[in-house]
């Protein structure tokens, strides 16, 4: 089950039907990862810079907003409460402009990125980064979204 809290109402001005949008991205990703049948409970909070900065400081001691924060709670199992994903519209909008990509594409990428983190993927080491980015690229491709790392590689 996907629980979505639109904490920051400006999401409604930027993404049409944000709850449906998020559910589609997460459910499609769970299916493509072959874990949909586990029916994990995932909470997603569509937030702003203020909330992400508070959480980033509280949990990571970084006093600045960030695009996505993930909090894994349990290992994947049937009907487990897998974790929470928080994303900041403010950061995503700025990054979308800087990257010259649609906000929907960047939001999809950050949702998938957050999902992979609550599934215990990380990008601290080069091999782990390669694995995580490869999965992100594959899942985004299934959604018709181009590789977000291409511009960094060329």
UniProtKB/Swiss-Prot annotation:
Enzyme Commission (EC) number: 3.1.-.-
Cofactor: how and how many bound: Binds 1 zinc ion.
Top EC class, one word: hydrolase
Annotated localization: Cytoplasm
Binding site for Zn(2+): 113, 117, 123
Gene Ontology MF term list: metalloendopeptidase activity; RNA endonuclease activity; zinc ion binding
Record-level GO BP terms: rRNA processing
A Pfam cross-reference name: YbeY
InterPro entries named in the record: MetalPrtase_cat_dom_sf_prd, YbeY
Role of this protein: Single strand-specific metallo-endoribonuclease involved in late-stage 70S ribosome quality control and in maturation of the 3' terminus of the 16S rRNA.
The protein, known as: Endoribonuclease YbeY
Organism: Ehrlichia canis (strain Jake)
Lineage: Bacteria, Pseudomonadati, Pseudomonadota, Alphaproteobacteria, Rickettsiales
């Amino acid at each position: 089950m996907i629980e979505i809290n639109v904490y920051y109402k400006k999401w409604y001005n930027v993404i049409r039907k944000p709850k449906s949008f998020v559910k589609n991205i997460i459910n499609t990703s769970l299916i493509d990862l072959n874990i949909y049948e586990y029916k994990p409970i995932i909470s997603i909070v569509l937030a702003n810079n203020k909330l992400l900065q508070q959480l980033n400081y509280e949990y990571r001691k970084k006093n600045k907003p960030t695009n996505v924060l993930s909090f894994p709670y349990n290992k994947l199992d049937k009907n487990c409460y897998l974790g929470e994903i928080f994303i900041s519209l403010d950061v995503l909008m700025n990054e979308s402009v800087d990257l010259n990509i649609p906000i929907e594409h960047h939001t999809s990428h950050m949702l998938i990125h957050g999902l992979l983190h609550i599934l215990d993927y990380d990008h601290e080491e080069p091999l782990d980064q390669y694995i995580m980015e490869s999965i992100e690229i594959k899942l985004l491709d299934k959604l018709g979204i181009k590789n977000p790392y291409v511009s960094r590689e060329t």
